[in-house]
């Protein structure tokens, strides 16, 4: 059953169109990698899926999803964020506060469980800014998990990580998808990772987008012709 259906979707920013008439769907338990050149609209799509940006045309239909966990790209300012690991993970529950001013016992328990699931419980009292890049990404992934058990939107989750931390992050995401059936939508420039882990690939480009299985993508012109524009 589809959790997200994008129908005839058109997106743009600053008055410039980045994609038009895009159609794809995401089912429960899917692992969709979104690839494409810079400026093709990948991050704009993430904002639209999160409800932070209205489409220029078409529609986004969500079924059975109350909350979406989001792991954004980090900048240098965010890497030095002055908070403990526990506080960062707990902030994933902000959307569930509603009119409440304080976190509940359930919120705090959820944060502890997410830290334990990702193996960072011993870091709970450490300052986020003192952690390595790989540890910080684990914390942000735990924060996204704390928001939801249904779907994760990950925008370049391995950006800036060394090879060992990159492999660790990909394995974590894959386990959450395979073992816990959490739906994953991940923006990436790493085509090899998309082919290794994803069940489907959405290639965004100026020409009609490609949307199919990872195996079909491997055999498509999008992948064959310099991994560039689609010529389907």
Residue ranges and their predicted role:
Residues 105-123:
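Conserved ABC ATPase "signature" region
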Residues 163-165:
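Helix N-cap at the start of a conserved alpha-helix in ABC-type nucleotide-binding domains
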Residues 152-155:
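Catalytic Walker B motif of ABC-type/P-loop ATPase nucleotide-binding domains
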Residues 188-189:
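H-loop/switch region of ABC-family ATPase nucleotide-binding domains
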Residues 200-214:
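H-loop (His-switch) and adjacent beta-strand-loop-beta switch element
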Residues 127-131, 135:
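Conserved ABC ATPase signature
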């Amino acid at each position: 059953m589809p959790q997200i259906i994008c129908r005839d979707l058109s997106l743009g920013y600053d008055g410039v169109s980045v994609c038009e008439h895009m159609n794809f769907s995401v089912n429960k338990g899917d692992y969709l990698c979104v690839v494409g050149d810079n400026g093709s609209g990948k991050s704009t799509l993430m904002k639209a899926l999160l409800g932070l940006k209205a489409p220029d045309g078409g529609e986004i239909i969500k079924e059975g999803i109350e909350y979406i966990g989001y792991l954004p790209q980090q900048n240098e300012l965010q890497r030095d964020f002055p908070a403990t690991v526990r506080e960062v993970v707990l902030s994933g529950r902000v959307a569930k506060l509603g009119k409440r001013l304080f976190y509940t016992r359930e919120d705090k328990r959820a944060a502890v469980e997410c830290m334990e699931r990702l193996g960072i419980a011993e870091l709970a009292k450490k300052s986020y800014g003192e952690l390595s890049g790989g540890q910080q990404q684990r914390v942000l992934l735990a924060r996204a998990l704390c928001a939801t058990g249904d779907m994760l939107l990950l925008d370049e989750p391995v950006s800036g990580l060394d090879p060992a931390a990159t492999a660790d992050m990909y394995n974590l995401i894959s386990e959450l998808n395979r073992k816990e059936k959490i739906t994953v939508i991940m923006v990436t420039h790493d085509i090899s990772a998309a082919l290794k882990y994803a069940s489907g690939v959405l290639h965004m480009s100026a020409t009609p987008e490609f949307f199919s299985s990872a195996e079909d993508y491997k055999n498509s012109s999008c992948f064959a012709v310099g991994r560039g524009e689609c010529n389907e």
